[in-house]
C-alpha cells in the first residue's frame, strides 16, 4: 500500500494500514509544503529578477531620447519567461521610427481620448529622477507580471494576454503614488505624444502639444484624402520590431502628384514641329504664322512657337492678329489631295488644265502634269509627276471618295453627294489658299550677274570647221 497516495482509496482498510497511513500523512504534508515552498522560492527569485530588470528599465527610460533607441519591453518580458538571455539592442536614434512605433503599437486597441490623456498625465508625473530608485520599491506583487501568477502555481500555463492595459479606469480617476504603479510600457510610450511634426530642439518637453494622437495615420504633415485607413496586425508589428527597428515606421500611402492643368495646352493638339516635320502643314490663311492644325478646331490665339519653314519675298507680310473673324481652313493637319482637286475645280481660272465635264461630279485633268506640278508646289515636292499623283488617287478608290471613269483618259468623278463634298472640303465656307508660281519666283539678288558677257557680239567657235548658226538672240551654239 506504500504506492497509494492520500487521494486514492484502497479496497480494504485494516487497522495496521490505517495506522500506517496516519504515520505517512505528516510526511506527505511536509512534502507538499516543501514543494510549495520551493515553487514560491523559485517564483520569488523570478519575480525579483524581473523587478530588478524593471528598475533597470525605468532608470534607462529616463535617458534623453537622442541617446539611444529601446526595444519594446514586452519582447524582453517574453524572453524572461522562457529563460533566454536578455539583450537590449542599441541602434542610432530615429525620431520618426520611434514616434511611429509608439503610435503603431497602440493601434489595435481602441481608447477614448480621455483615457489616453489619463495615461499621459499619470505616467509623466510618476517618472522618477535619473539614477534614483522610486520611493516605493517594486515588490513581487507589484511587478507587471505578478497579477498573472496569483491564481495558482500553474499560472504559467494560462494564456497570457498580449497587452495588459487597465482600460477600465475612468478618465477622471487619478492614480496615487502608493497604489499599483503604472506599467513601464506606459511610461515610455504614452508619455510621449505622437506629433505630426518633429519637435523643435529649443522647445522644452512641457511646451510640446500634449495628447495629440494618431491611431492609424502615418507621420505626414497633411491628412491623406481618399485613402483607406487600416489597423495593422500586432503580430506583424512584433515581427518587424524583432527583425529591425528601422522597419517599424510604416510607409506612407502612395501620394500621386497631380500637376496643375495648363489650359493653354491640349494634350491632343499635335505640336507645330510634328505638323511641319514633312513640310505638309502650310496653313490656308494668308498669315501663316498663326495657329496650329489639329482635329478639334483652331486655336484662336497667336502661337509664336510655330515656325513656317519657308518664307518667300513674294509673300504678303501681314501683322499677325490676336483674334480672327473666322477659323482658317484646317482639316486633320494638312490639305488632302481630294480637297486640293475640289479647290482647283472651284476656281474658274484653272479651267485650262482641270475642269468639270458637266456629267454629275465628273472632272477631267486636261493637263495632268500641270495638276501634278501644282500639287508638288503645294506639298513642297518638286519631283511630283502624274504617275505619283495617280497612285495617290487610287487610295481614294478604296475609301469610296472618287472613282476612275472607265473608257476615258484622265477623267475621274466624286461618288459622294455634292453638298457633302463641298461641306467637307470647305468647312465653314473657308476656301484654302493654294500656292502659285508667284511664291516660287527667283530673286535677282540670288543670281550671279553675267556682266562679263557682251550680248551684242556673236561668239565664234575656235575651230572654223563649221559655219555658225545665228539665232535671234544673237548667240551662236
Curated annotation (Swiss-Prot):
Name listed for the protein in its UniProt record: ETS translocation variant 1
Cross-link (Glycyl lysine isopeptide (Lys-Gly) (interchain with G-Cter in SUMO2)): 317
Function recorded in the entry: Transcriptional activator that binds to DNA sequences containing the consensus pentanucleotide 5'-CGGA[AT]-3'. Required for olfactory dopaminergic neuron differentiation; may directly activate expression of tyrosine hydroxylase (TH).
One example GO MF annotation: sequence-specific double-stranded DNA binding
Organism: Homo sapiens (Human)
Phosphoserine, modified sites: 94, 191, 216
UniProt-annotated location(s): Nucleus
Keywords: Activator, Chromosomal rearrangement, Disease variant, DNA-binding, Isopeptide bond, Nucleus, Phosphoprotein, Proto-oncogene, Transcription, Transcription regulation, Ubl conjugation
Record bears the keyword DNA-binding: yes
Matches recorded under InterPro entries: Ets_dom (IPR000418), ETS_fam (IPR046328), ETS_PEA3_N (IPR006715), WH-like_DNA-bd_sf (IPR036388), WH_DNA-bd_sf (IPR036390)
Gene Ontology biological-process entries: axon guidance; cell differentiation; mechanosensory behavior; muscle organ development; peripheral nervous system neuron development; positive regulation of transcription by RNA polymerase II; regulation of transcription by RNA polymerase II; transcription by RNA polymerase II
Tissue: Very highly expressed in brain, highly expressed in testis, lung and heart, moderately in spleen, small intestine, pancreas and colon, weakly in liver, prostate and thymus, very weakly in skeletal muscle, kidney and ovary and not in placenta and peripheral blood leukocytes.
Family: Belongs to the ETS family.
DNA-binding region: 335-415
Free-text description of this protein's post-translational modifications in UniProt: Sumoylated. Phosphorylated at Ser-191 and Ser-216 by RPS6KA1 and RPS6KA5; phosphorylation activates transcriptional activity.
Disease / disorder: Ewing sarcoma: A highly malignant, metastatic, primitive small round cell tumor of bone and soft tissue that affects children and adolescents. It belongs to the Ewing sarcoma family of tumors, a group of morphologically heterogeneous neoplasms that share the same cytogenetic features. They are considered neural tumors derived from cells of the neural crest. Ewing sarcoma represents the less differentiated form of the tumors.
Alphabetical list of Gene3D superfamilies matching this protein: Winged helix-like DNA-binding domain superfamily/Winged helix DNA-binding domain
Annotated spans, Disordered: 128-179
An example Gene Ontology CC term for this record: nucleus
